[in-house]
């Protein structure tokens, strides 16, 4: 980072990704952080921590991104990752009805445990599976159900594709606009009050930190 960039005000935003396994959370992060996509990707075991900086309106926005495991056995440990988050992406697969209802549960839990100040974006991922489907026969959830949830819970809503990159950057850009900007934000990311560094994977069962070589994982 050069001296000019270092002088630009920086807003740090902690973002947590939640959703059922295999809805594409890690692929969304990988697309945003590295502009990459892997057709075959192993499920997240634990949680991955990644960062990405963008410049917007004369300030640097640093996203501290927690990509959490979607398996049910890890769900009780998720609060340690969404605690103190300013924003959340709650992801579902547009072709999987069950994943939408799981996303709805996550939204309700966030509002119950974190409060209503957190900015939540509901993301319908895998739109690439529908782009050639004129009749939307493969779409699991119709617009009214999604819109009702967004209006009731005051959510942002995006339909996206980690595979093609559709709307991925726009999701994070919008979070950067919606999260309030304090005069100074010096919060550090931590797990059990332990500071960690970029691009590391967390073992949710033992809460130990392990290095990883992986670099990535429209309003209603």
Swiss-Prot record:
It is a lipid-anchor. The keyword Transport applies. One of its GO terms (biological process) is protein targeting to vacuole. GO terms for molecular function: GTP binding; GTPase activity. The modification Cysteine methyl ester is found at residue 220. Keywords: Cell membrane, GTP-binding, Lipoprotein, Membrane, Methylation, Nucleotide-binding, Prenylation, Protein transport, Transport. Pfam families: Ras (PF00071). Its main location: membrane. Signal peptide: none annotated. GTP binds at residues 19-26, 67-71, 125-128. It is found in: Cell membrane. GO terms for cellular component: cytosol; early endosome; endocytic vesicle; endomembrane system; late endosome; plasma membrane. The keyword Nucleotide-binding applies. A lipid is attached at residues 218, 220 (S-geranylgeranyl cysteine). Required for transport in the endocytic pathway and for correct sorting of the vacuolar hydrolases suggesting a possible intersection of the endocytic with the vacuolar sorting pathway. May be involved in recruiting the MON1-CCZ1 complex to membranes enriched in phosphatidylinositol 3-phosphate (PtdIns[3]P) or other charged lipids, leading to recruitment of YPT7. NCBIfam families: small_GTP (TIGR00231). Belongs to the small GTPase superfamily. Rab family. Present with 830 molecules/cell in log phase SD medium. This is GTP-binding protein YPT53. The gene is YPT53.
């Amino acid at each position: 980072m050069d001296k000019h960039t270092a002088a630009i005000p920086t807003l740090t935003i902690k973002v947590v990704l939640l959703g059922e396994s295999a809805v594409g959370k890690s692929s969304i992060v990988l697309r945003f952080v590295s502009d990459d996509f892997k057709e075959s990707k192993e499920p997240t075991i634990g949680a991955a921590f990644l960062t990405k900086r963008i410049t917007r309106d004369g300030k640097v926005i640093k996203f501290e991104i927690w990509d959490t495991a979607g398996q049910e056995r890890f769900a009780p440990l998720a609060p340690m990752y969404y605690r103190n988050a300013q924003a959340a992406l709650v992801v579902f697969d547009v072709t999987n009805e069950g994943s939408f209802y799981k996303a709805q549960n996550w939204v309700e839990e966030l509002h119950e445990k974190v409060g209503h100040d957190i900015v939540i974006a509901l993301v319908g991922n895998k739109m690439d599976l529908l782009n050639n489907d004129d009749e939307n026969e493969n779409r699991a959830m119709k617009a009214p159900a999604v819109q009702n949830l967004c209006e009731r819970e005051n959510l942002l809503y995006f339909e996206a594709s980690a595979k093609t990159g559709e709307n991925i950057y726009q999701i994070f850009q919008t979070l950067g606009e919606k999260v309030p900007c304090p005069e100074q934000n010096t919060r550090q990311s931590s797990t059990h009050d332990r500071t960690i560094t970029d691009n590391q994977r967390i073992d949710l069962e033992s809460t130990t930190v392990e290095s990883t070589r992986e670099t990535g994982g429209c309003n209603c």
